């Protein structure tokens, strides 16, 4: 009885934590559902539905990462865990007519779970912020000298510097007329 009670408490604690960490995406889903109900254009309906799938995929994969984190012995996740999450998220972006690809350094290296979550959260933040203006995204995560680095190539006709100003840790450079390079180091 006591073990069952403790297990139920731990499950509730984890679910509450996940809900708190993803409150912004849950709110976004609610807004998108409201938009979906109001839209009369089939094209707009499909676009909004695609965005709902993208956010829903993130919620599902992030929950999986957190649960994997808490079932591991030492609060670790692997690059493979991140790779699987990015694969599913990139696949869902097709519904928004965005070409998406990723590269996560090979190896089943175990890393601090918070670092892996930051990498995935950064991807989602970029997607949410830029899904209306980008045509393609290539998201790369590599580990150099024990430091995780994120580098992103984005094709967009919009000035991304303005859209991403609220995240000063993301360095934004314009490479060509419609090509942008975004980079950051995942700080512990």
PLM features: residue spans?
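Structural alpha-beta junctions
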Residues: 57-60, 67, 91-100, 168-173, ...
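Conserved ATP-binding N-box helix of the HATPase_c
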Residues: 25, 29-32, 36, 110-141
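Short, non-transmembrane amphipathic alpha-helical segments
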Residues: 122-128, 160-171
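Helix-loop-beta hinge of the Bergerat
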Residues: 79-115
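Short beta-strand/loop element within the Bergerat-fold HATPase_c
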Residues: 138-153
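Signal-transmission coiled-coils
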Residues: 1-93, 120
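Acidic ATP/Mg2+-coordinating residue in the GHKL
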Residues: 151-157, 186
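Flexible, glycine-/charge-rich segments associated with ATP-binding catalytic modules
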Residues: 8, 41, 163-188
């Amino acid at each position: 009885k006591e073990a069952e009670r403790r297990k139920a408490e731990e499950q509730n604690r984890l679910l509450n934590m996940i809900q708190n960490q993803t409150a912004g995406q849950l709110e976004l889903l609610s807004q998108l559902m409201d938009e979906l109900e109001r839209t009369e254009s089939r094209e707009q309906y499909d676009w909004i539905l695609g965005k709902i799938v993208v956010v829903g995929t993130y919620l599902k994969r992030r929950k999986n990462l957190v649960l994997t984190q808490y079932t591991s012995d030492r609060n670790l996740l692997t690059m493979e865990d991140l790779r699987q999450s990015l694969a599913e998220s990139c696949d869902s972006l097709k519904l928004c007519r965005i070409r998406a690809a990723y590269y996560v350094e090979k190896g089943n290296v175990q890393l601090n779970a918070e670092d892996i979550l930051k990498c995935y959260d950064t991807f989602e933040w970029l997607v949410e912020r830029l899904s209306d203006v980008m045509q393609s995204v290539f998201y790369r995560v590599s580990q150099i000298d024990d430091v995780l680095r994120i580098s992103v190539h984005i094709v967009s006709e919009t000035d991304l510097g303005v859209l991403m100003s609220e995240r000063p840790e993301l360095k934004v450079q314009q490479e060509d007329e419609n090509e942008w390079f975004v980079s950051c180091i995942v700080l512990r």
